[in-house]
Amino acid sequence: MHVTIQGAGRGIGLALAHHALTAGASHLYLTARNPEQSAGYAQLPPTPNIHWFAMDFLDPDSIANTGDSILADAPHLDRIITTAGLLHDGNLQPEKRLGELTPDAMLKLYQINAMGPILFFKSLWPELRRAHPLVAA
């Protein structure tokens, strides 16, 4: 089984990568913003069966290029999973009142949590259109 997991650098994505390996995945195509600096990369270093790609949901070109690279490396995909999302970071905290909302924060959250996953699936569209069974989540 060939599995792509977006957001495999830590958290849920990393847990799913470990699960995919124990469930018998033959190839993993994993993404993280900075793979070499991620916990996932330390736990699942690149091998002939584990492929890491740098991808940033705030950069549409990064998403498209990553999709192209995955499609070039993978003979086919059986699972495409996207897990990354953002609730807060150094400058962005969950809002408790409407007065705390800012256009910049809302745009960043929308880009990462809504547009990023859709653009990632779009970048893999040739694989999604194939006739073989594929699960995308």
Language model features with spans:
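N-terminal Rossmann NAD(P)H-binding glycine-rich loop of SDR-like oxidoreductase domains
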Residues: 9, 15-18
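Conserved Rossmann-fold cofactor-binding substructure of NAD(P)-dependent oxidoreductases
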Residues: 58-73
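Catalytic Tyr-X3-Lys loop
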Residues: 99-118
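Rossmann-fold cofactor-recognition segment
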Residues: 45-61
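Conserved internal alpha-helix within the Rossmann fold of NAD(P)-dependent oxidoreductases
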Residues: 116-121, 134
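Hydrophobic positions on the long internal alpha-helix
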Residues: 120-124, 128
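Conserved glycine-rich Rossmann-like NAD(P)H-binding loop of the short-chain dehydrogenase/reductase
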Residues: 21, 25-40
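Conserved NAD(P)H cofactor-binding loop of Rossmann-fold oxidoreductase domains
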Residues: 83-94
